[in-house]
C-alpha cells in the first residue's frame, strides 16, 4: 500500500519532451499523438470513400450516419442558409477531439518510452485546447465580419452602450471556457484511471474506463456544439 501511495505521488503532470525548432520549444509528445489521430482520421476517410456505391453498405453506410450526425450539429446551431459552409470546420473539431480523447483513454501510451514525460492525448495539454479554442474564436469573428462588415461590432453596444465592457469580456471568456473545460475534464479522467490502476493493479478498472470514454465523447460534442453556437450567434441578425 505504501509503495502504491508513493507511485501515485510520483505521477508527473506537465513534464514535456521538447523539440527545438528554429529557436522554439515544441511539445514533441503532443505532436506525435496528434499525428496519430490525424492519420487514423485520414485512413478512415480513405476506407469509407474508396469504391463508393450508390446504395451505401457496411463502412460507407456507417460513415454516412456519422456525417449526418456531424451535419446536424452545425444545422441545429447555425442558420439554414449558412450552416453548410461551416460543416467541415465543426466536423473537423469534433472528430479530432473525439479521436484524441479516445486515444488517450484506450492506448497504453506508458508502454512507449520517450526521453522525457510520457505520451498522452493531445487534449491532455492546455496548449492544444487553447489552440482549438482560438481557432473557434477566429472563426466566429470571421463569420460575423464576413456577413456584416464593421456593423458586426455594433453588437457590443446592443441593446445599450452600458453593456460594452461586459460584451467585450464575454468574447474573451468564450475561448477560455472552451479550452479549460476540455483540458480539465480530460486530465481529470486520465488521472482517475491512473490512480485506479495503481490501487488495483490486478483488476483493470473497466467501469472507470467506460465512463471515461463516455465523458470523452461528451466533451467532444460539447466543444463542437458550443463552437457552432458561437458562430451561429455571430451570423444572427441582432435587432
Swiss-Prot record:
It is a multi-pass membrane protein. Gene3D superfamilies: ATP synthase, F0 complex, subunit A. The chain crosses the membrane at residues 30-50, 87-107, 126-146, 191-211, 212-232. The keyword Ion transport applies. GO terms for molecular function: proton-transporting ATP synthase activity, rotational mechanism. GO terms for cellular component: chloroplast thylakoid membrane; plasma membrane; proton-transporting ATP synthase complex. InterPro entries: ATP_syn_F0_a_bact/chloroplast (IPR045082), ATP_synth_F0_asu (IPR000568), ATP_synth_F0_asu_AS (IPR023011), F0_ATP_A_sf (IPR035908). The keyword Chloroplast applies. Its main location: plastid. Disulfide bonds: none annotated. Keywords: ATP synthesis, CF(0), Chloroplast, Hydrogen ion transport, Ion transport, Membrane, Plastid, Thylakoid, Transmembrane, Transmembrane helix, Transport. It is found in: Plastid, Chloroplast thylakoid membrane. PANTHER family: ATP SYNTHASE SUBUNIT A, CHLOROPLASTIC. HAMAP family: ATP_synth_a_bact (MF_01393). Key component of the proton channel; it plays a direct role in the translocation of protons across the membrane. F-type ATPases have 2 components, CF(1) - the catalytic core - and CF(0) - the membrane proton channel. CF(1) has five subunits: alpha(3), beta(3), gamma(1), delta(1), epsilon(1). CF(0) has four main subunits: a, b, b' and c. Belongs to the ATPase A chain family. This is ATP synthase subunit a, chloroplastic. It comes from Cyanidium caldarium (Red alga). The gene is atpI.
